[in-house]
Amino acid sequence: MKPTVLTENSRVEGCSFIKQHKFSSGHIVPIYDVSTMNALNQIIGHVKFQNANYGNVYYRGVSGLYDNVLPALMRGRTKGIPDDLCQALNSIINDSYFQNSLKLSTTVVPRKKDDFSFNKRVTRYNKYCAEALLQHYAGSTRFLDVVDNHWVALWMGLHEFKTHGKGKKFFHSIRRSLSAWDMYEAQMKDDNFEINKNIYAYILLVAMPYPECPPQYGIIETANFVEVDLRKALPSIYLRPHAQHALVVRRRDKGNIEQKAGYYDMASQVTAILRVRIDRVSNWLGEGTLLTQGNLFPSPSIDQGYNNLLMNSEIFKDPFDIKKYF
């Protein structure tokens, strides 16, 4: 069963069909321009309703569109079985400090046949948890970040993340803005007769299938995908994902027979793309402190889990070193 893609004939007032977006995989989805808050709520609700028998629909806020939806670690790689990531995950789940801090499940001494499959599953789920942790605090794994709160997705699409300092180890978010003159300039067509795309924030609506078995500690494993709700998989001392309403999703490794990086492209799960002009996004979000970097990326003085990661930096080697936000 596949997710239902929104058609180009939606009649939601305040939404205008722009064009079809074709990913390199061949998957095609519509781009809709959204001009009102009510229209945003309604068209998201419509996509959820269309996929009610398939699964949940999550949101990925981005500042630009690409021809794929590859996780960060797989961009620029050809090999789909990353030995460096596997080594990092083993280091985390075998470290006694993080076994306790992350409340990882423990294996049992095998006494019967079923114990071996139990231990294998425990190890696999512990690695899912560790990889989800790395995705949120290091930012480069096989997982893709999504949220189930569309104003957080809008915030992510409104901001650009810049690197600073030696080795580009420090990160800071910059809120994009649009003056009246910028708006006039941006609407002018360029030499290719295309409207400037830098004036928009985008939300990718990503559908994930329902599980056949109940989730365990926020982890859902289906035939082809893994989904981790970090608010359930990680203790709340790891505050950032709880502030962001964060989940991560990816394809399961077992289907990557050819061991290619492109296997992890999640474009097939995108059901629609919504674009909103950044001046509208800024107006809708307002100036509340809940939607600031200070809340969504709390400092290590507040986010105890973040501090734990920074204090154990010897485990987290490039490209899985913990990113520092300021």
What is each model feature region?
Residues 1-326:
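Catalytic-core elements of nucleic-acid end-processing and repair enzymes
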